[in-house]
Amino acid sequence: MANTPQAKKRIRRNDRRAEINGNRVNRIRTFIKKVESAIAAGNKSEAETALASAQPELFRGVSKGVLHKNTASRKFSRLAKGVAALA
């Protein structure tokens, strides 16, 4: 248990940041699911628009520190590959 005032403040701050970061990751997952569901449905135009809206969310996660840049690039690359495979 935290004894010093600074340690107590850090616990409060960590809890706030964990909630914010969790919401960010959840938002990114939602955008990814939209693209994946459009790909599964075979709807190319919907998949393209969903991918275009998912890209900035993925890389915003990188700049905010909730995703590694290679992870975001890999996820985006795989989604783009799935969209490109739709004919």
Swiss-Prot record:
This is Small ribosomal subunit protein bS20. GO terms for cellular component: small ribosomal subunit. One of its GO terms (molecular function) is small ribosomal subunit rRNA binding. InterPro entries: Ribosomal_bS20, Ribosomal_bS20_sf. Keywords: Ribonucleoprotein, Ribosomal protein, RNA-binding, rRNA-binding. Signal peptide: none annotated. HAMAP family: Ribosomal_bS20. SUPFAM superfamilies: Ribosomal protein S20. GO terms for biological process: translation. The keyword Ribonucleoprotein applies. Belongs to the bacterial ribosomal protein bS20 family. Pfam families: Ribosomal_S20p.
